[in-house]
Amino acid sequence: MWALCSLLRSAAGRTMSQGRTISQAPARRERPRKDPLRHLRTREKRGPSGCSGGPNTVYLQVVAAGSRDSGAALYVFSEFNRYLFNCGEGIQRLMQEHKLKVARLDNIFLTRMHWSNVGGLSGMILTLKETGLPKCVLSGPPQLEKYLEAIKIFSGPLKGIELAVRPHSAPEYEDETMTVYQIPIHSEQRRGKHQPWQSPERPLSRLSPERSSDSESNENEPHLPHGVSQRRGVRDSSLVVAFICKLHLKRGNFLVLKAKEMGLPVGTAAIAPIIAAVKDGKSITHEGREILAEELCTPPDPGAAFVVVECPDESFIQPICENATFQRYQGKADAPVALVVHMAPESVLVDSRYQQWMERFGPDTQHLVLNENCASVHNLRSHKIQTQLNLIHPDIFPLLTSFPCKKEGPTLSVPMVQGECLLKYQLRPRREWQRDAIITCNPEEFIIEALQLPNFQQSVQEYRRSAQDGPAPAEKRSQYPEIIFLGTGSAIPMKIRNVSATLVNISPDTSLLLDCGEGTFGQLCRHYGDQVDRVLGTLAAVFVSHLHADHHTGLLNILLQRERALASLGKPFHPLLVVAPNQLKAWLQQYHNQCQEVLHHISMIPAKCLQEGAEISSPAVERLISSLLRTCDLEEFQTCLVRHCKHAFGCALVHTSGWKVVYSGDTMPCEALVRMGKDATLLIHEATLEDGLEEEAVEKTHSTTSQAISVGMRMNAEFIMLNHFSQRYAKVPLFSPNFNEKVGVAFDHMKVCFGDFATMPKLIPPLKALFAGDIEEMEERREKRELRQVRAALLSRELAGGLEDGEPQQKRAHTEEPQAKKVRAQ
């Protein structure tokens, strides 16, 4: 081990020394360039669309069944193509958990430009780009192109992937699997027929950007990136786009055994033209005998159709019923519709006009309903791990709750099925419902699995014995603030850890969010169940640390659902205070202008105005800051720039009672954060990477676990919660010797009060027992990485002509910025 450390220090010293570059010591190998995806090469070999006939297997599968926490989304599979209908928040996470391959997804269809349908699209596009997919085609409302333009404000240029937009007015689309027809549908008299929480379009004269958020003076107006239009678009909430999808004809299968019985030259080159002829429906003559095509082939499948239609409210019913394109597919034997997917609320389904429209498709057409009445567990792995963690400490790791459906669906005279996560309808080879993939949540199985793990029960019992000397649970749980970790992973949502979001319950009736990544509302639903509206009603402010997608793309859904919650609680609506980099306003402004009205939801406080010594020139901002402090009962809300991307901030909350919570956001070790957080009661600090990956941490401007702990110790924080782990540590990070009695590890849905600080370190042994297999795998990966580094060090030493034994090497402190790599700290 001493020799290993010596070699690693030698390699580190040479790579960081002056006059040498990092490239001279190949400790980190560049990733090989991605080859073209295999399915694309296979497609090229098959030739133009339709040349080989239709696919053998086609099915539709429910990704999200329409519940309030998950939205509605549909996945369509064939061996040639993959399709996704709608992409709300959390869809990428569900596809990853249930192994629905994102990398094969080359077509996304959107039924309307509403956040419930597009909230996960920006993250999905970034993931598709990372997989190497060269092109993705998006179909839907005309604002779709402007939406893709707007997300560049925070994603940057989307190089490496071609995003082709097919407007709803374009002619039909055809590929190897099917032909897709887009049907635009406009509501009748849309204006004025809305529920208060649905964010109807207001006249522009009543809602200028200045009126919607008086927090910014002209000097604070955000500047849009190059290529992003500043012109106001035409929002159209009265438009939805339905899709009729017609499968290509599938030629019959050649009956080899029957051909042998007839004496045909099976197994020779002469059989090829015979097969081609009979598959085309032509008869052949063999030895003077005419053989009909149906004697040698199974019957062809003419290709059924399926329909995907969204009917958001009753104002769309009549236009749908009167649509001529739908009428051509209703009750026609030559164009059978196998399935109609209805994304519609109960108020639509019980309407007699809509029911009559459904009946006109005929008795052989199946109907699938996706709406909030569909009760289905979606995030099974999250429920599993929480059930097992609950065995360790039921208060800190509370059980999750499924968001309840309201009531039984309406009784209809057509074959109707309510959606469930992973429910399938197979269109080919035979039409049928398939329920074998539907997930079931069985807590008893999760508990038995955990209790059978070696040393788990023993470690839990030992922890409980050691905890008896602590304060009584009732005393601990009555304290505020209460910290709820809703998302503790980095970069992209994954099956166990969602992306950044932390709820701080300051008091029973006041809370704020620290960051708000994609899927935050869904996490709130799973944590609070039917109490989620009450929690949204207490939300006073949101802090957004920076404009990376994993920290802010859940904000819009929180805003929309909060308005709905206030209406259901009978509370008056008022804008939510949002503390964020000024650039967030540019994104919200673009989405507001082009897609959906949202600016009336926020009152914006630029994060830079809360820095120490910042001058506030706008009286409006001063009023908002005063309101923030008064509403949250805070003595101070301070921000500082941290060492991550441009315009990245950390924050410190100082309560009037004296406690202080500091949140790092994303950052490398940062002196400004240390100064701002001095004597914090609690530091929540990102710990994206494990120890030993300091160089990667610098490259990605993040912190390792020991670096995060060091920041807390220098800050003199009473306790340190590590957060924002790389998804390579899906269940638990690697523990280091620096973990002490002042350090805890955050998990999704973890609930922590200040009275739990003494308990947190005692949880580590049971956690190690629960995740022993995962820790072993991570340690093996670390050993392999260190072995590669040793080999690289030996090679570097050999190339350098060797070093004298005992030559001193000064290991560079990883909390300082290497001279060899200039990292911008804003």
UniProtKB/Swiss-Prot annotation:
Residues that bear Phosphoserine: 199, 208, 212, 229, 618, 736
UniProt entry keywords in alphabetical sequence: Endonuclease, Hydrolase, Metal-binding, Mitochondrion, Mitochondrion nucleoid, Nuclease, Nucleus, Phosphoprotein, Transit peptide, tRNA processing, Zinc
Biological process per Gene Ontology, one example term: mitochondrial tRNA 3'-end processing
Protein name listed in UniProt: Zinc phosphodiesterase ELAC protein 2
Annotated family: Belongs to the RNase Z family.
Organism: Pan troglodytes (Chimpanzee)
Pfam family, one: Lactamase_B_4
Subunit structure: Homodimer. Interacts with PTCD1.
Compartments, as annotated in UniProt: Mitochondrion; Mitochondrion matrix, Mitochondrion nucleoid; Nucleus
Encoding gene (name): ELAC2
